[in-house]
Amino acid sequence: MRRAAVLTAGSWGSVFAKVLADAGARVNLVARDPEIVRAVNTRQVNPRYLPAIQLPDRVRAMSDAGEALAGAEFVVLAVPSQALRSVLAGWAPLIGPDAVYVSLMKGVEVGSQLRMSEVITQVTGVSPDRIAVVSGPNLAPEIAAEQPAATVVASTSTSTAEAVQAACWTPYFRPYTNTDVIGCELGGAIKNVIALAAGMLEGMGFGTNSLASLMTRGLAETLRLGVALGADPMTFAGLAGLGDLVATCGSPLSRNRTFGEKLGRGLTLAQVEAEQQQVAEGVRSCRPLLAMADDLGVAMPITRQVERVLYEGLPPMEAVKDLMSREPGPEYRLRP
């Protein structure tokens, strides 16, 4: 029986623990909250994030990361992207030398501009061949309810990707493999920023044409930056690109879309952050993504306007006007 450790017991981490267990693994779920540990181990429920979902008996919760990581073949990392470096530094000495690292995170680190797999390598020294990235249209509540969904498992090592694929394949969760880690991680990070913009449109009362235009041009930004960084353009037409973008921009279950909707209704960044407890990754990722684009001479006008709304106090309606008043040009332009 496969053994996995999931760190930590947030919404997506808990759901992925369920997926792994339903696929046959024994799963240790790390939770800091003693109440979550008790509830999972006595009632198979995570009362904070998945109160209506019964977790499989093969999922056990614990607060001791060392205990959870002992003997784990797969170490699944599901923490806020900006916290990864600090928490992984403490966990790294506890992880076995042959374990595969599985990243569920969708963000870019502020300051370093590193993708999450790059942070894992930098902190642990592990080879990229032992890291897999899971990315796709994976809204946690729907997967928890066992609604059919697909995802991408990306690794520079085909055998690593296939091992993780086998470990998380269930009747309701279908993983595909890919070797384009750059494209899959960028797709997951940038779609959060575009989803903030999609939420702003919703909050301002705009309709389907506006949303479709935003999503399509947001995908163009993603493609341009991805190509400049060496990603495969086809990745962005797949689950980790278009698929994730559609789910995150279109669903009220999306944290980033919900966050953006509140901004579109007139709330400030500070007000929304005080009101919304769960992390909206696009809020922190937009600046390092813009820095990457600027370094490469890549135009990302939507991302730039989102950054202005978040950090310069630009009214969302003014951001729309600025985007629509830009000089028009050709639709397809991969290179700067």
UniProtKB/Swiss-Prot annotation:
Sn-glycerol 3-phosphate binds at residues 106, 136, 191, 244, 254-256. PROSITE patterns: NAD_G3PDH (PS00957). It is an enzyme of class 1 (oxidoreductase). Pfam families: NAD_Gly3P_dh_C, NAD_Gly3P_dh_N. Its main location: cytoplasm. The keyword tRNA processing does not apply. One of its GO terms (cellular component) is cytosol. It is found in: Cytoplasm. Pathway: Membrane lipid metabolism; glycerophospholipid metabolism. It catalyses: sn-glycerol 3-phosphate + NAD(+) = dihydroxyacetone phosphate + NADH + H(+); sn-glycerol 3-phosphate + NADP(+) = dihydroxyacetone phosphate + NADPH + H(+). NCBIfam families: PRK00094.1-2, PRK00094.1-4. This is Glycerol-3-phosphate dehydrogenase [NAD(P)+]. It comes from Frankia casuarinae (strain DSM 45818 / CECT 9043 / HFP020203 / CcI3).
